[in-house]
UniProtKB/Swiss-Prot annotation:
It holds the Pfam family TsaD. This is tRNA N6-adenosine threonylcarbamoyltransferase. It is found in: Cytoplasm. GO terms for molecular function: iron ion binding; N(6)-L-threonylcarbamoyladenine synthase activity. It comes from Desulfovibrio desulfuricans (strain ATCC 27774 / DSM 6949 / MB). Transmembrane segments: none annotated. InterPro entries: ATPase_NBD (IPR043129), Gcp-like_dom (IPR000905), KAE1/TsaD (IPR017861), TsaD (IPR022450).
Length: 361
């Protein structure tokens, strides 16, 4: 089965083709440089850029893949959560394409796709603990199957990735700040600054990073007054050691918090021997190291995709669509988009006859 995946939930316009679980080709247009001028994503500009590039990117993808449009069996698209205007561009394009080709149509949960992205590189193993850490979400899931994920904990205010970007902005780092903060942290010492580990004085599995963000911002205002470095800072070369140390301490506080909650979830679910790490913050080198060590100590395994599959991409949408499509799942063309802040409805339909036919081929 050939599945086209379309991703337009935020500021990346991306399309990919997955055939029988294998990535054939992917194309992407990023808006990072444009939004960096404003210090964050401007929703109206994001949706206009998606509209501008989605058609040409589809044409480019099909040329590279040496596939014809008529060979597409399933069109999968990120339906949410995300920015409403951005989602609408991708969903409208996907619906029109599926209708014109007579292909099946499927709306994919953007968060679920992140959790499944590692399957493009290595076998996914279940049941597993899913730790999704991105700019908009910090969630824990009990994953019984690729399409059966039980929420265990969620972000109550600022997500980890959002905290990285906002503190990076206070520090004068180029947007988005998370990647550069990771690099700066690698050259700093974390033991000189005692940032709090937020929301650990309870027995639940939810996250809250607003207090840590405020603590870091206050520290910068109190200790970095009068200090100068190039702004926006785009590399580690011109950064003073004090800045590197601050990034190291903040980075460690975030990672400690994530790993503490993950450990708590594993202790309560001892049958979970695998941990799937996903989302843009899964690119963080310290987080990848600590999660790997955590699972090794417990005799389990950490499943972590390559950094190129952690950030928003269409390969994960196409792969999630293929996994669901081969089980016979699909949506009707009146499916709605679901912006951030709303729960995705369980409205997929299933054609069991199609799934049985597919399993025999």
């Amino acid at each position: 089965m050939l599945c086209l995946g379309i991703e337009s939930s935020c500021d990346e316009t991306a399309l990919a083709l997955v055939e029988d679980g294998r990535l054939l080709h992917s194309v992407l247009s990023t808006q990072a440089d444009m939004h960096a001028l404003f210090g964050g994503v401007v929703p109206e500009l994001a949706s206009r850029e998606h509209y501008r590039y989605i058609g040409p990117l589809f044409d480019e993808l099909m040329r590279r893949s040496d596939k014809s449009n008529e060979e597409i069996d399933l069109v999968a698209v990120a339906r949410g959560p995300g920015l409403l205007g951005s989602l609408l561009v991708g969903v409208a394009f996907a619906k029109g394409l599926a209708f014109s080709l007579g292909a099946r149509f499927l709306g994919v949960n953007h968060l679920q796709a992140h959790l499944l992205a590692a399957g493009l590189e290595q076998p996914l193993k279940f049941p597993a603990l899913g730790l999704l850490v991105s700019g908009g979400h910090t969630h824990l899931y009990r994953m019984e199957t690729p399409w059966n994920c039980l929420p265990l904990g969620r972000t109550l205010d600022d997500a980890a990735g959002e905290a990285f970007d906002k503190v990076g902005k206070v520090l004068g780092l180029a947007y988005p700040g998370g990647r550069l903060m990771d690099a700066l942290a690698g050259e700093g010492r974390a033991d000189g600054i005692a940032f709090p580990r937020p929301y650990l004085d309870n027995d639940n599995l939810d996250f809250s990073f607003s207090g840590l963000k405020t603590a870091a911002s206050t520290y910068v205002q109190q200790h970095f007054a009068g200090m100068t470095w190039p702004r926006p800072l785009g590399s580690t070369a011109a950064a003073p050691q004090e800045l590197k140390d601050c990034c190291a301490a903040f980075n460690l506080a975030v990672v400690d918090t994530l790993c503490t909650k993950a450990t708590r979830a594993l202790d309560r679910n001892p049958q979970l021997k695998y941990l799937i790490l996903a989302g843009g913050v899964a690119c963080n080198s310290l987080l990848r190291q600590r999660v790997t060590e955590l699972m090794e100590r417990r005799g389990g395994q950490a499943i972590i995709p390559g950094p190129h599959l952690c950030t928003d991409n269409a390969a994960m949408i196409a792969y999630a669509g293929w996994l669901l499509g081969k089980e016979g799942y699909y949506h009707q063309l009146n499916m709605e988009t679901v912006p951030r802040g709303r729960a995705l409805p369980d409205d997929m339909r299933r054609c069991r006859e199609y799934a049985e036919d597919l399993s025999e081929t």
